[in-house]
């Protein structure tokens, strides 16, 4: 199953989960409200997600005068990928990492931490930037924003189901089998958030493999990205980002939380070893 098809299936599963929860909480009217809520939140995510994440990490525009090598690499890769030149931002963070954001290629941003160019060679930096441009090319930022937003809607509806179970609400409260309806609300409140999280993680992991493959094609050097991933993974374990948020961890090229034991239980990224193996088999 291809990465794009798998992502489509998983997004459809998240949407179906939202509609199902809406039905469990409020019947046909609940299903409609759930759908509208998901739509409204997705529109907001589309327009404002990039501004929010850049502000979260105190990222500032990086001028070409301050980083001519970064700009030269990004310009060359953008031309190779047939993409507009993205804006480049700097994150004041010693842990080496990078991410891309923006609702479309015309509004794309690549953000790199101060620690990135301290430990990587120019070829390895090129591999990282190619990976981030691959996310832009594949519209992964839009996909991940939609997935995160839909997962947020699931959490809201699951909380509604929880309150419905506590206070005897739900569409089955007036039916003969009200106990079954109550049980359905309890099951929904417990399992729906877990299902949403697992689907979101599956989407994120699928898109990382695709970005590795596409980025290696842009740079014509999969080995440079493989070496960069090895260094970044080791640095992330030794020095995880202090201000990294679980809600945005999926944006980074390597998991910024990987040094924290609880974060490894449900990683937003596929195993580094498998990513490196795939790159070196290209």
From Swiss-Prot:
Its EC number is 3.4.24.-. GO terms for biological process: proteolysis. One of its GO terms (molecular function) is metalloendopeptidase activity. The active site is at 132. Its main location: membrane. Gene3D superfamilies: Metalloproteases ('zincins'), catalytic domain. The keyword ATP-binding does not apply. The keyword rRNA-binding does not apply. Binds 1 zinc ion per subunit. GO terms for cellular component: plasma membrane. It is found in: Cell inner membrane. Its cofactor is Zn(2+). CDD domains: M48B_HtpX_like (cd07336). Pfam families: Peptidase_M48 (PF01435). Keywords: Cell inner membrane, Cell membrane, Hydrolase, Membrane, Metal-binding, Metalloprotease, Protease, Transmembrane, Transmembrane helix, Zinc. The chain crosses the membrane at residues 7-26, 30-49, 141-161, 183-203. It is an enzyme of class 3 (hydrolase). Zn(2+) binds at residues 131, 135, 208. It is a multi-pass membrane protein. NCBIfam families: PRK03001.1. Belongs to the peptidase M48B family. This is Protease HtpX homolog.
């Amino acid at each position: 199953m291809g990465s794009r098809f798998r992502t489509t299936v998983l997004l459809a599963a998240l949407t179906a989960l939202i509609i199902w929860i809406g039905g469990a909480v409020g019947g046909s009217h609940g299903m409609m409200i759930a759908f509208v809520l998901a739509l409204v939140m997705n529109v907001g995510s589309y327009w404002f997600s990039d501004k929010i994440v850049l502000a979260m990490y105190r990222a500032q525009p990086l001028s070409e005068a301050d980083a001519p090598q970064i700009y030269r690499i990004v310009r060359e890769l953008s031309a190779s990928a047939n993409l507009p030149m993205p804006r480049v931002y700097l994150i004041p963070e010693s842990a080496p990492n990078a991410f891309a954001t923006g609702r479309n290629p015309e509004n794309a941003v690549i953000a790199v931490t101060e620690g990135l160019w301290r430990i990587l060679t120019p070829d390895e930096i090129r591999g990282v930037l190619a990976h981030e441009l691959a996310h832009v090319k594949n519209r992964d930022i839009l996909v991940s924003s939609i997935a995160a937003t839909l997962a947020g809607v699931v959490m809201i509806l699951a909380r509604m189901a929880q309150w419905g179970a506590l206070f005897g609400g739900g569409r089955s409260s007036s039916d003969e089998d009200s106990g079954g309806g109550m049980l359905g609300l309890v099951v929904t409140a417990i399992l729906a958030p877990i299902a949403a999280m697992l689907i979101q993680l599956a989407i994120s992991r699928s898109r990382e493999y695709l970005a590795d493959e596409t980025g290696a094609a842009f740079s014509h050097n999969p080995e440079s990205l493989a070496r960069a991933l090895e260094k970044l993974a080791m640095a992330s374990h030794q020095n995880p980002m202090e201000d990294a948020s679980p809600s945005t961890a999926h944006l980074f090229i390597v998991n910024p939380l990987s040094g924290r034991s609880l974060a490894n239980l449900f990683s937003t990224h596929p195993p580094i070893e498998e990513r490196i193996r795939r790159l070196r088999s290209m």
